[in-house]
Amino acid sequence: MDSYSAKIRANLVCRRSTDPSIRVTFSSRSLGSLPAFAMFRSSRPSFIKICFPFSSSIVLASGYSVRASMRSSFERQNRSE
């Protein structure tokens, strides 16, 4: 239950940031990692320091590269059939 409240607090802190894509990316990364919850529980400023280095351009670029690689592997699979 304590990790659940830590997740809520982390989401509240990140909601105050200006870029919503940072919140989505960081939340999806931290859902499965318990050390991240321990870090959130220790202090909020540490979360802010980690949250802000992620820029929206990095998030968009990584999302685009994942989509492009999935598309190319799908096309390769179709060609081989």
From Swiss-Prot:
Tissue: Expressed in brain, notably in regions involved in long-term potentiation and long-term depression, such as hippocampal CA1 and CA3, dentate gyrus and cerebellar Purkinje layer.
Note: Located on the opposite DNA strand of the CNGA1 gene at chromosome 4p13. Its transcription may play a role in CNGA1 transcription regulation.
Domain of life: Eukaryota
Protein name stated in the entry: Putative CNGA1-overlapping antisense gene protein
